[in-house]
Amino acid sequence: MNTPTQSFRAKAAIFSLLLLSCMQCHAQLSATFYDNTCPNALNTIRTSVRQAISSERRMAASLIRLHFHDCFVQGCDASILLDETPSIESEKTALPNLGSARGFGIIEDAKREVEKICPGVVSCADILTVAARDASAAVGGPSWTVKLGRRDSTTASKTLAETDLPGPFDPLNRLISSFASKGLSTRDMVALSGAHTIGQAQCFLFRDRIYSNGTDIDAGFASTRRRQCPQEGENGNLAPLDLVTPNQFDNNYFKNLIQKKGLLQSDQVLFNGGSTDNIVSEYSNSARAFSSDFAAAMIKMGDISPLSGQNGIIRKVCGSVN
């Protein structure tokens, strides 16, 4: 029969093993993960991303958004890339992604090129994470060191995509809680929202705002947006999220908010007399502060619940399970 001391030691040993296992799981994400197994992986991904963005500047925003929508559902596991099958209800068909999520082909192209030099080594989850970083850099935004070693999921969740992703009509408190549930601070949330310095939105997402005659929108801005977004029909018409420099990653997005020229309701709530006004003001005055915080927040987002070690797989094709 174990004595109390022996029992305590046994429990302590088990706890230590569990703690070590957890630490090793996180330690498996490393910037040097592919240095020996696929040293040219990052250059190969960068080439694919740059080619895509040189053909269509908007693709930079699409790739950053794709990474964001991946990480917020099951973690950064490339689940958003999986196609519909009898056993997989694809996240592509979820309302936040249907008809708006783009860049799948770019990730597949990058994966195909990487497979040519290192078959079965680099995950789609890592390719998507690196592509988001390279997309930012390609349009004048910050770059950062990406930790690598994620593995790919064998499942997807349309349900979680429809419940966990923040929406364009969300009030500030819901945005804050949504990001907090993923381990991201309010400051992270505001910085990541700054990705709307590039990209476009469909008419039906901002129609109510520009026809509301509300006090939180500049009348001239609303009038300009109405030209391409009538009160009825033309739901898919696009408008830039940043009307001033729509293809350049900068801090004009925050300057627009101060002028009540945020396109989406979820943009303008960041500067509307609430707790995030001071952060928006700071970023509007300092492109350096925004750039630094955006990079830091992207790194944190890339750490959301990754599969590593023996968990998950390395997909051969990003849209399907091996």
From Swiss-Prot:
Heme b binds at residue 196. Coiled coil: none annotated. GO terms for cellular component: extracellular region. Ca(2+) 2 binds at residues 197, 242, 245, 250. Its EC number is 1.11.1.7. Disulfide bonds join 38-118, 71-76, 124-318, 203-229. Ca(2+) 1 binds at residues 70, 73, 75, 77, 79. SUPFAM superfamilies: Heme-dependent peroxidases. Residues 1-27 form the signal peptide. The record marks 65 as: Transition state stabilizer. Its cofactor is Ca(2+); heme b. The modification Pyrrolidone carboxylic acid is found at residue 28. The active site is at 69 (proton acceptor). The keyword Protease does not apply. It is found in: Secreted. Glycans are attached at residue 213. GO terms for biological process: hydrogen peroxide catabolic process; response to oxidative stress. Pfam families: peroxidase. One of its GO terms (molecular function) is metal ion binding. Substrate binds at residue 166. Binds 2 calcium ions per subunit. Binds 1 heme b (iron(II)-protoporphyrin IX) group per subunit. Belongs to the peroxidase family. Classical plant (class III) peroxidase subfamily. Removal of H(2)O(2), oxidation of toxic reductants, biosynthesis and degradation of lignin, suberization, auxin catabolism, response to environmental stresses such as wounding, pathogen attack and oxidative stress. These functions might be dependent on each isozyme/isoform in each plant tissue. This is Lignin-forming anionic peroxidase. The lineage of its organism: Eukaryota, Viridiplantae, Streptophyta, Embryophyta, Tracheophyta.
